[in-house]
Amino acid sequence: MGGRVVELLITYDVETATPQGARRLRQVAKICEGYGHRVQKSVFEITCTPTTRLHLEAALAKAIDPAHDSIRIYQLDRGTFATAHHLGAAPKPPHTEPLVL
């Protein structure tokens, strides 16, 4: 990923008492999975360009019901993800090196 990148921590709380809410939850998770790495059930670490961040935020805003759902996006200092400490079972880190097939 060339150029400027940002590290984002995304957390969300989507109301799931209705089938529509459960659908929104799956949609939010699927969107986040397309951009980053799930580190907890409703928490993702994403490294992207500022332009990609705009696309991500637009997709998430479209997916939720703002009257019932909440998404928080924290922009972190670059390199913050590398300093994370885990207690308990930690998720596997994302593959960051180029793949040779």
PLM regions: where:
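C-terminal structural segments of small proteins and small subunits
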Residues: 63-100
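Extended, hydrophobic alpha-helical segments
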Residues: 1-39, 43, 47-52
